């Protein structure tokens, strides 16, 4: 079972549908309606932290889930979930270089892990005003995708299967978003 933590976002069920193409065993829970202990009891094979409004400080249990389950379960964070990954490991999340709500832009990625099989650059959908600030990125996280102007678009933990995507792979404006989700579900992260 894949656990999808919902940060009260309208994209959560789009993400649910994409994940369901590759694994139909999904449980959706709200970020303030579950505990670490309950997640332990559920014993998901992986965890997805959804997009959402606001900042990691307002994302319920998400930062704690990332801290607790890193090294135990694969984790994918999308948009706010990506920012929660940054915050969980000590990065600063602050205003992005450019506010991007419902806009498409090209990102340049390293072609590994979640980006396996994809050309670089790839066009993605962005809906965010916050971003991980590069100069605060901890040593345990590596940047695996950026925009042309240097905004971080994806990070990966160097030792554990934890990946964050600032953009929305579940949006129709993201090229090859299904492939990215498929890579994650199949453990290619």
Question: Which residue ranges define each predicted feature?
Answer:
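C-terminal and late-domain segments of enzyme folds
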Residues: 142-189
């Amino acid at each position: 079972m894949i656990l999808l933590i919902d940060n009260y976002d309208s994209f959560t069920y789009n993400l649910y549908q994409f994940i369901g193409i590759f694994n139909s065993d999904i449980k959706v829970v709200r970020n303030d309606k579950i505990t670490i202990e309950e997640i332990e009891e559920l014993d998901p094979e992986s965890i997805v932290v959804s997009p959402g409004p606001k900042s990691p400080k307002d994302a319920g249990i998400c930062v704690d889930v990332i801290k607790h389950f890193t090294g135990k379960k694969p984790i994918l964070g999308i948009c706010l979930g990506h920012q929660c990954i940054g915050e969980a490991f000590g990065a600063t999340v602050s205003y992005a270089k450019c506010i991007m709500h419902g806009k498409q832009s090209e990102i340049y990625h390293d072609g590994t892990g979640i980006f396996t099989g994809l050309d670089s650059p790839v066009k993605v959908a962005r809906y965010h005003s916050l971003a991980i600030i590069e100069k605060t990125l901890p040593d345990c996280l590596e940047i695996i995708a950026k925009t042309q102007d240097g905004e971080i678009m994806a990070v990966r933990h160097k030792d554990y299967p934890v990946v964050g995507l600032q953009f929305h792979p579940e949006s129709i404006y993201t090229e090859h978003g299904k492939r990215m989700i498929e890579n994650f579900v199949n453990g290619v992260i």
